[in-house]
Design a protein with these regions (language model features):
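Nucleotidyltransferase catalytic core that binds NTPs
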Residues: 1-209
Length: 209
């Protein structure tokens, strides 16, 4: 398997396969996970399989650095839902560094800590196609690209290009979002099959959304 590294200007083949490297290969999928849903899990699992990664860490943020701050629920609920969602799924785990650090979750700060803590690990930071366009605005992006390899995931009806190095991965298109799940709940509609059943059971038990 060869992996394409795409920018608007270049198209090159990366060989050998990532999994043949001796260093540990770890993907990171960050997000608010408010709540986690099946599209999150499919993305994490497909990236892990297609790139031959050792594992993918789902990393809940404490406070997103966006200007339009998200309204979110307490982190212990989001963390518990993640634990329920990945239980028994091979190759998926949770990274809680941003919840532990608290404050605004800048990716550069987080990855600086992780790379220093785990010098034998190569990190692959997974983002949606919509976020690729915003890479030039990311905090300390030119230093961040030295710490991680970005992995772009195609999203329905969205195409992106960037001059930054991004490995593109195709996954089954599922137009599901956390806001969709919350809207369903607010309307009294059960979001069946949009998220793992244990997560839905937890939401109903705790009266979330």
């Amino acid at each position: 398997m060869a992996i394409e590294l795409l920018t608007p200007f270049t198209k090159v083949e990366l060989e050998p396969e990532i999994k043949e490297k001796k260093r540990k290969q770890v993907g990171i999928l960050g997000g608010n996970f408010n709540p986690v849903h099946n599209a999150h899990l499919i993305v994490a699992d497909q990236v892990r399989q297609q790139l031959g990664l050792d594992q993918v860490l789902l990393m809940p943020e404490y406070q997103p650095p966006h200007v339009d701050k998200k309204e979110t629920i307490p982190e212990h609920h989001r963390l518990k839902m993640l634990e329920l969602a990945i239980e028994g799924i091979e190759g998926l785990a949770i990274e809680t560094i941003e919840l532990e650090r608290k404050g605004i979750s800048y990716t550069y700060d987080t990855m600086k800590i992780l790379t220093e803590k785990n010098p034998d690990t190569d990190y692959y930071f997974i983002i949606g196609a919509d976020m690729v366009d915003y890479l030039p605005k990311w905090y300390r992006i030119d230093e961040l690209v030295d710490l991680v390899q970005f992995v772009g995931v195609q999203r329905p009806r969205y195409k992106a290009g960037t001059s930054y190095p991004v490995i593109w991965v195709d996954v089954p298109l599922m137009d599901i979002s956390s806001s969709m799940v919350r809207d369903f709940m607010a309307q009294g509609r059960k979001p069946n099959f949009l998220l793992p059943q244990p997560v839905l059971d937890y939401i109903e038990k705790e009266g979330l959304y």
